[in-house]
């Protein structure tokens, strides 16, 4: 089990260039860092949760990290390889709003049926609250995960069928930047959109 070569092969670099918003140099640097932190070339859910916990030291990020991990792990093998990592990172950090919303939708759609049910939304919102509620003051109409979920559904579920389609999700988020803030649980990032 020798040390993996941290230089990306030309065909891999070509694939990542086509599927991310990163430059060749950035891709090489990210790969070096990824292999330094994950010498096996794969990140497990437990390793991912430890990393995520560093970003949210005042809350419990483990449940939310599991949802993010599941969304990064596009082939469903229980690990994140460099390709999965860098493509998800590209979408979440440099993607256009619509790409970010599609990615968020796939995270919220826990069973992968193409809709977000109220219970799926509540599960994610509860995970977010566990992660940040100790450091974020919520408005009264969002003071509990249930209230926040109700507010999101009131604004997004335009056909009142009790579930959100991708179209409703994207349309709702685009028409009201506060929904993006609700989904991200990061008031400062709403101004980026």
Curated annotation (Swiss-Prot):
**Record-listed Ca(2+) 1 binding positions:** 73, 75, 77, 79, 84
Q: Which GO terms describe its molecular function?
A: calcium ion binding
Give binding positions for Ca(2+) 2: 109, 111, 113, 115, 120
The entry's cellular-component GO terms read:
membrane
The residues that the entry says bind Ca(2+) 3 are 157, 159, 161, 163, 168
Q: Which key words are in the record?
A: Calcium, Lipoprotein, Membrane, Metal-binding, Myristate, Repeat
Lipid-anchored residues (N-myristoyl glycine):
2
Q: Which parts of the sequence belong to the EF-hand domain?
A: 41-58, 60-95, 96-131, 144-179
Query: Which membrane topology describes this protein?
Result: Lipid-anchor
Its subcellular locations are: Membrane
The record ties this protein, via Pfam families, to:
EF-hand_7 (PF13499)
Any extra remark in the record? Answer: Probably binds two or three calcium ions.
Q: What does this protein do?
A: May be involved in the calcium-dependent regulation of rhodopsin phosphorylation.
Please name the PANTHER family in this protein's record.
Answer: CALCIUM BINDING PROTEINS (PTHR23055), HIPPOCALCIN-LIKE PROTEIN 1 (PTHR23055:SF79)
Per the record, the similarity remark reads:
Belongs to the recoverin family.
This one is known as Hippocalcin-like protein 1
To which species is this protein native? Pongo abelii (Sumatran orangutan)
Q: Which gene encodes it?
A: HPCAL1
């Amino acid at each position: 089990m020798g040390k993996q070569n941290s230089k990306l092969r030309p065909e891999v670099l070509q694939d990542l260039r086509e599927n991310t918003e990163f430059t060749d140099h950035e891709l090489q640097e990210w790969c070096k860092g990824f292999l330094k932190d994950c010498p096996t070339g794969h990140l497990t859910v437990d390793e991912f949760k430890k990393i995520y916990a560093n970003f949210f030291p005042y809350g419990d990020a483990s449940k939310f990290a599991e949802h993010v991990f599941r969304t990064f792990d596009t082939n469903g093998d229980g690990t994140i390889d460099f390709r999965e990592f860098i493509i998800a990172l590209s979408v979440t950090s440099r993607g256009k709003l619509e790409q970010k919303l599609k990615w968020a939708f796939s995270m919220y759609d826990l069973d992968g049926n193409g809709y977000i049910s109220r219970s799926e939304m509540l599960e994610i919102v509860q995970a977010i609250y566990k992660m940040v509620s100790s450091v974020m003051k919520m408005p009264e109409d969002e003071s509990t995960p249930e209230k926040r979920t109700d507010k999101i559904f009131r604004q997004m579920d335009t056909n009142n069928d009790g579930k959100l389609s991708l179209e409703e999700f994207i349309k709702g988020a685009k028409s009201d930047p506060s929904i993006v803030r609700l989904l991200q649980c990061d008031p400062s990032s709403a101004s980026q959109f």
